[in-house]
């Protein structure tokens, strides 16, 4: 069973942000007001491509308890093609990660919570192999 709050988060599953119709800047997660245009800007829902590159990363060896089974794993800031930067796990061999490699979002199991083992899903990034 997926927790209800996760089923209703467009950002969590589909990388949906907003784009300002006035200046064209893209935001993720979604915003209600454009920080550049302020009230002059009108925002619209925008589907991000999910493609980008590793901006920076860290390898996690001492995770929170719900991530113990994944250790070690990579957490990164990914700069998306549209501009926003997103923090997420990268599903890859820790020896094959480096700054600048191209990645894309993929739907993945994130973690299990509590005694009941409630599974949370969302996006992780995976290297794009050419």
UniProtKB/Swiss-Prot annotation:
GO terms for molecular function: metal ion binding. Keywords: Metal-binding, Zinc. It holds the Pfam family zf-ChsH2. InterPro entries: ChsH2_C (IPR002878), ChsH2_Znr (IPR022002), NA-bd_OB-fold (IPR012340), Thioester_dehydratase-like (IPR052513). Zn(2+) binds at residues 20, 23, 34, 37. The keyword Transport does not apply. Belongs to the scaffold protein DUF35 family. Functions as a scaffold to connect the acetoacetyl-CoA thiolase and HMG-CoA synthase (HMGCS) dimers in the channeling thiolase/HMGCS complex, which allows for efficient coupling of the endergonic thiolase reaction with the exergonic HMGCS reaction. Interacts with acetoacetyl-CoA thiolase and HMG-CoA synthase (HMGCS) that catalyzes the first and second step in the mevalonate pathway, respectively. This is DUF35 domain-containing scaffold protein. It comes from Methanothermococcus thermolithotrophicus (Methanococcus thermolithotrophicus).
């Amino acid at each position: 069973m997926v927790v209800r709050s996760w089923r209703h988060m467009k950002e969590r599953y589909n990388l949906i942000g907003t784009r300002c119709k006035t200046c064209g800047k893209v935001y993720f997660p979604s915003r209600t007001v454009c920080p550049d245009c302020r009230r002059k800007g009108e925002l619209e829902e925008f589907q991000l491509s999910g493609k980008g590159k590793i901006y920076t990363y860290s390898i996690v060896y001492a995770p929170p308890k719900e991530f113990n089974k994944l250790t070690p794993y990579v957490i990164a800031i990914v700069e998306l093609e549209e501009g926003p930067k997103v923090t997420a796990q990268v599903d890859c061999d820790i020896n094959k990660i480096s700054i600048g490699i191209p990645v894309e979002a993929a739907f993945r199991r994130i973690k299990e919570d509590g005694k009941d083992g409630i599974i949370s899903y969302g996006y992780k990034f995976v290297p794009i192999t050419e």
